[in-house]
């Protein structure tokens, strides 16, 4: 039931009871009967404040107080943000699936171009999702051509958020190690940089509908600050045509890897029952090409921070896609396009007759395509295949169970007699250790030596000289 409305008369009754000493001792019914005659004699102007107070009380009753969580945040607002985030994730997945499925239906999946992007940042605002960019890179990739082009630049934002210099210095020293403003390197005009990025994307995605945004892909944990960095650059644009950064849509590259792997296996006619998002994420996060030399920018190559370089990131992602799916599409990989131009092999050759097979979690590039057995080269046997090769081995085992000896004969095992003497010596030492001095002194005065324990006299007597 809806709450009862307040009346001006009851507002007057409550005020009369609070201000009149006589009314404090009366009940509600008695106060109503006493105030009824007074209320009838009041004019409309005198009743006005009480009627307006009743209306205000009705409004306050309808307005409920918002519940807060343990962090002091409005619970309804938090739930709204969670719903928006979930809807955004679903929208990103649907867009990725639509792109891959359209390419598959047109039988042109291996020639479809994808753009991988990455940002480095100096610092993040405490209360908002504003990130100050430090470096940007993008790469154009397709299965058939590999890496087709790379765009990379350092960014000088001019200044960082006030009061966050220490945080920016710590983040920089532990990651990309880029100098902070005002000593930062790279492009200083944010609007010009944003226009250059849009021009680069427009050349890649020719024939795109002008009303639709450019689609780029980045790592899952990078999606929030990549979107924020694009908005940061768009706000500095002078013409104001891309003020909100809506011209670029950022999607999840790890979900793209999962969808592409399933569709590639379907094209190849291979079962994809064992492929799920956890498997593809584990493969992507292994980052087989993390320490590949000469694929980062000059600054990070000289400062030995190529792992955090955005240019190295977008190229390593492209190598991972080629490494994971080019073999399923029967596409021959080319150094510098699908795989790094320089790589130090870190593997051993397993013969073709071995039962050791390549694991599905291993890199396809890290194992040679063919292994030919040479006659003059030594064969490396695995533990699983060594049992089968024993029949052809020249080794003849020897039976060591044919020797039989009598353990009671000292001439066959002379060391056993020495062991008995050693045991007697140990017992004698333990005896002297436990006995008091008064009992041990007569033994030494009688000329008893340790040799007597090893060679006992023919007369069987105990240690005290008594006959046994």
From Swiss-Prot:
InterPro entries the UniProt entry points to: HMG_box_dom_sf (IPR036910), Maelstrom (IPR024970), Protein_maelstrom (IPR039259)
Listed Low complexity bias regions: 381-393
Alphabetically ordered keywords of this record: Cytoplasm, Developmental protein, Differentiation, DNA-binding, Meiosis, Nucleus, Oogenesis, Repressor, RNA-mediated gene silencing, Transcription, Transcription regulation
Top-level taxon: Eukaryota
Region of interest called Disordered, as start-end residue ranges on this chain: 374-393
Compartment annotation: Cytoplasm; Nucleus
The UniProt record lists the keyword Nucleus: yes
DNA-binding region: 2-69
Pfam families registered for this protein in UniProt: Maelstrom
Predominant location category: cytoplasm
Record GO cellular component, one term: nucleus
Keyword Protein transport annotated: no
GO biological process: germ-line stem cell population maintenance; male meiotic nuclear division; negative regulation of DNA-templated transcription; oogenesis; piRNA processing; regulation of miRNA-mediated gene silencing; regulatory ncRNA-mediated gene silencing; spermatogenesis
GO molecular function, one term: transcription cis-regulatory region binding
Function (record text): Involved both in the piRNA and miRNA metabolic processes. As a component of the meiotic nuage, plays a central role during oogenesis by repressing transposable elements and preventing their mobilization, which is essential for the germline integrity. Repression of transposable elements is mediated via the piRNA metabolic process, which mediates the repression of transposable elements during meiosis by forming complexes composed of piRNAs and Piwi proteins and governs the repression of transposons.
Family recorded in the similarity comment: Belongs to the maelstrom family.
Name of the protein in its database record: Protein maelstrom 2
Organism (species): Drosophila ananassae
Lineage of the species this protein comes from: Eukaryota, Metazoa, Ecdysozoa, Arthropoda, Hexapoda
Gene that encodes it: mael2
């Amino acid at each position: 039931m809806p709450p009862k409305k307040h009346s001006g008369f009851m507002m007057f009754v409550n005020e009369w009871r609070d201000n009149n000493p006589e009314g404090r001792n009366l009940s509600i019914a008695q106060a109503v009967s006493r105030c009824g005659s007074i209320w009838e004699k009041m004019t409309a102007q005198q009743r006005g404040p009480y009627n307006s107070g009743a209306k205000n009380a009705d409004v306050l009753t309808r307005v409920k107080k918002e519940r807060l969580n343990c962090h002091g945040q409005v619970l309804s607002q938090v739930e709204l943000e969670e719903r928006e985030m979930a809807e955004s994730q679903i929208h990103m997945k649907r867009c990725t699936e639509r792109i891959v499925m359209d390419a598959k239906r047109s039988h042109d999946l291996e020639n479809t171009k994808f753009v991988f992007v990455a940002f480095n940042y100096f610092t993040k605002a405490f209360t908002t999702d504003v990130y100050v960019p430090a470096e940007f890179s993008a790469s154009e990739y397709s299965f058939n051509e590999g890496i087709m082009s790379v765009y990379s630049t350092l960014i000088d934002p001019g200044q960082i958020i006030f009061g966050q210099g220490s945080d920016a210095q710590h983040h920089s020293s532990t990651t990309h190690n880029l100098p902070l403003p005002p000593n930062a390197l790279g492009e200083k005009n944010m609007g010009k940089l944003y226009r250059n990025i849009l021009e680069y994307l427009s050349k890649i995605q020719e024939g795109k509908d002008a009303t639709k945004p450019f689609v780029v892909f980045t790592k899952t944990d990078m999606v929030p600050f990549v979107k924020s960095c694009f908005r940061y650059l768009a706000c500095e644009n002078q013409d104001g045509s891309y003020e909100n950064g809506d011209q670029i849509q950022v999607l999840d590259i790890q979900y793209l890897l999962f969808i592409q792997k399933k569709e590639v296996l379907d094209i190849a006619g291979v079962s994809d029952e064992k492929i799920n998002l956890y498997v593809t994420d584990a493969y992507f996060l292994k980052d087989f090409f993390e320490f590949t030399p000469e694929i980062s920018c000059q600054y990070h190559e000289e400062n030995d921070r190529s792992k955090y370089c955005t240019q190295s990131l977008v190229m390593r992602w492209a190598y991972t896609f080629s490494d994971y799916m080019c073999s399923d599409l029967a596409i021959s990989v080319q150094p510098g396009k699908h795989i790094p131009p320089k790589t130090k092999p870190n593997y051993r050759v397993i013969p073709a007759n071995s039962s050791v097979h390549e694991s599905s979690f291993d890199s396809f590039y890290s194992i040679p395509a063919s292994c030919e057995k040479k006659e003059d080269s030594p064969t490396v046997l695995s533990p699983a295949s060594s049992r089968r090769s024993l029949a052809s081995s020249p080794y003849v085992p020897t039976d060591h169970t044919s020797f039989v000896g009598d353990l009671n004969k000292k001439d066959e095992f002379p060391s056993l007699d020495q062991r008995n003497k050693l045991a007697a010596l140990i017992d004698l030492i333990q005896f002297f250790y436990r006995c008091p001095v008064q009992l041990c002194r007569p033994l030494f005065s009688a000329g008893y030596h340790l040799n007597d324990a090893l060679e006992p006299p023919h007369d069987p007597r105990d240690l005290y000289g008594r006959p046994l």
